[in-house]
Amino acid sequence: MLNWRDPRNPLAGGAERVTLAYLRGLVERGHEVTWFANAFPGGAPEEKIDGIRVLREGGKFTAWLAARKWHSEQDPFDLVIDQHHGIPWYAPNWCPDKCVAYIHEVLGPIWDAFYPWPLNAIGRWQERLTLRQYSEVPFWTASDYTRELLTEQGVETIVQIPYGVATRALEELPEKELDEPLRLITVSR
């Protein structure tokens, strides 16, 4: 698994939680799993998380070079998962092993929300170009909408694996007095 962040990265979010759950499932089925991610201050260069070998090397702009070098020194892998989040690892260009692209969302207009011009325009352009370059690489996503956007960009093979939901119901919901008016806030990213 090539992902810019791993579960212990201070900037890790939902994508890393979902990825960890999928990879944990592979380990439980007897597979050997390695997760290559960016290094971060205070992060060990290597550790095991839930049976997954996590390697951290390189930074925001150099991790893909470190991954490429590290991969070239390894025996072949059965599968390399190139996780996209804005910018992929371009593994099909340097990895002779079978590659799958894993994507949670096509960023598209999200570039505008996080980056000023011209970075937003460059990001959108790069993403469209990248998806065309990856058109023959099998993609894996969970969302119908992402599948539709990938299809519009010319991606030929898309496997949709819905997100699993692990919930534990409250055994008891304590009574509590609520003041009127009731207000609710939801925060997400």
Please name every model-derived segment.
Residues 4-18:
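A short, glycine/small-residue-rich beta-strand->loop->alpha-helix junction that serves as a flexible
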Residues 5-9, 25-61:
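N-terminal strand-loop element at the rim of the active site
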Residues 56, 70-89, 100:
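Short N-terminal targeting/anchoring amphipathic segment
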Residues 79-81, 94-112, 119-120, 140:
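Active-site proximal beta-strand in glycosyltransferases
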Residues 118-140, 148:
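Membrane-proximal helix-turn-helix segments that form the acceptor-binding/catalytic region
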Residues 140, 176-189:
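Conserved donor-binding/catalytic core segment of Leloir-type glycosyltransferases
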Residues 145, 161-164:
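Carbohydrate-associated surface elements
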Residues 151-156, 164-181:
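Acidic anion/phosphate-binding donor-loop and adjacent secondary structure
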